[in-house]
């Protein structure tokens, strides 16, 4: 069956105040990979899609001489996390270690010259192990910024608290600031905080996955405003964002040009996995305890994702790994270089094992149908 493309619904206005100020954004991929088990993060299951080994994107945000890091990824010696977290890691995932953010800053030979000692603040999107890194690697002049309620559920950490999920060393001697969204600022439908006070960088309240979960929005150009949205773990796969009624699934022939694999008519096979204007997945309750809030957060991101002027980067998007400029390069020129349009549907290649499975299944069913017809004749 060939599905006709759906007419897209016009996306809503971004609702972002004008500003002449921008920040430089550098995406940091430390090389660490984390296995994502689909049943933990998204639903429904797709036969043949058993998960993936995904990166963890962190971000260096520079506002003139001021530098902050949004998320730190996994520490290289993850066995030195709190014992409770080490047990969870061993039971639920596989970590393929790479480097870490402070090492990449301090060992960079590009001439950029931004070192760990220059970082004014580390921002945790939330307090899960694959985002908190090792804050103690930064000097005590580096503040730690967390979302609402995170201090209360995080500290005392281990070893003061035997059941701690973060470490005491993350905050010993360090200023910890908890973000407030009580000022009433809105970016799109998100409650927001203007981090530098000039409209260049916002922290956004994005609940659902964890207490105090934050996303961020950076203004990357001003004359024609463009933005990078840092989605953290608001969702764990682009298939929760797309297709949407703003970005419907393209034609089978267009998809065939995106997909890399041998099944005949892969675009038509892919169209059987979802409706043309509904995402492949929704968030799974197990890792999104506030399921209603998480679903609403994804809906808000879909509105930004539909804008030609906003590039959405979620933390674990494997499809972008070798397609976007990485540290020490900036990603500010993403629109001019057509990063968004050229990568929008690349994540569908994650489903190639599922398409093989579906192709084989339909081939078997077709053959059984032929045999049944022969017996009846």
From Swiss-Prot:
Q: Which domain of life is it from?
A: Eukaryota
Record's keyword terms, sorted:
Hydrolase, Metal-binding, Zinc
Q: In which pathway does it act?
A: Secondary metabolite biosynthesis; terpenoid biosynthesis
Query: Which EC number(s) does the record attach to this protein?
Result: 3.1.1.-
Gene3D superfamilies xrefs: Ribonuclease Z/Hydroxyacylglutathione hydrolase-like (3.60.15.10)
Q: Binding residues for Zn(2+) 1, per the UniProt record?
A: 126, 128, 209, 233
By sequence similarity, the record places it as follows: Belongs to the metallo-beta-lactamase superfamily.
What is the name of this protein? Metallo-hydrolase mfmC
Naturally occurring in which organism (per UniProt): Annulohypoxylon moriforme (Filamentous fungus)
Taxonomy, top ranks, is: Eukaryota, Fungi, Dikarya, Ascomycota, Pezizomycotina
């Amino acid at each position: 069956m060939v599905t006709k493309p759906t007419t897209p619904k016009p996306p809503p206005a971004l609702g972002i105040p004008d500003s002449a100020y921008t920040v430089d954004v550098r995406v940091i991929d430390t090389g660490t990979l984390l296995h994502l088990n689909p049943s933990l993060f998204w639903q429904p299951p797709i036969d043949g899609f058993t998960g993936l080994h995904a990166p963890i994107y962190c971000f260096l945000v520079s506002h003139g001489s001021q530098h902050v890091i949004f998320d730190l990824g996994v520490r290289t010696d993850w066995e030195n996390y709190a014992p409770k977290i080490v047990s969870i890691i061993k039971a639920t995932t596989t970590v393929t270690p790479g480097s870490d953010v402070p090492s990449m800053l301090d060992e960079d030979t590009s001439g950029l010259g931004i070192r760990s000692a220059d970082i004014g603040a580390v921002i945790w999107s939330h307090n899960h192990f694959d985002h908190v890194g090792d804050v103690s690697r930064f000097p005590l002049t580096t503040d730690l910024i967390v979302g609402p309620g995170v201090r209360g559920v995080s500290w005392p950490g281990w070893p003061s608290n035997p059941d701690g999920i973060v470490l005491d060393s993350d905050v010993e001697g360090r200023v910890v600031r908890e973000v407030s969204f009580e000022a009433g600022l809105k970016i799109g439908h998100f409650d927001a905080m203007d981090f530098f006070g000039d409209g260049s960088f916002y922290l956004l309240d994005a609940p659902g996955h964890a207490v105090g979960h934050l996303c961020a929005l950076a203004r990357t150009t001003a004359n024609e405003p463009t933005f990078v949205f840092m989605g953290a773990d608001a969702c764990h796969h682009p298939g929760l964002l797309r297709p949407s009624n703003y970005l419907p699934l393209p034609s089978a022939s267009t998809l065939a040009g995106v997909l890399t694999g041998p099944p005949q008519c892969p675009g038509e096979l892919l169209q059987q996995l979802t409706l043309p204007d509904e995402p492949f997945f929704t968030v799974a309750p197990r890792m999104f305890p506030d399921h209603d809030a998480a679903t609403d957060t994804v809906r808000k991101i879909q509105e930004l994702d539909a804008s030609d002027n906003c590039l959405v980067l979620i933390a674990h998007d494997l499809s972008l790994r070798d397609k976007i400029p990485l540290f020490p390069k900036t990603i500010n020129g993403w629109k001019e270089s057509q990063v968004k349009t050229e990568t929008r549907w690349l994540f569908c290649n994650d489903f190639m094992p599922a398409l093989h499975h579906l192709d084989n299944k339909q081939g078997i069913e077709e053959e059984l149908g032929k045999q049944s017809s022969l017996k009846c004749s």
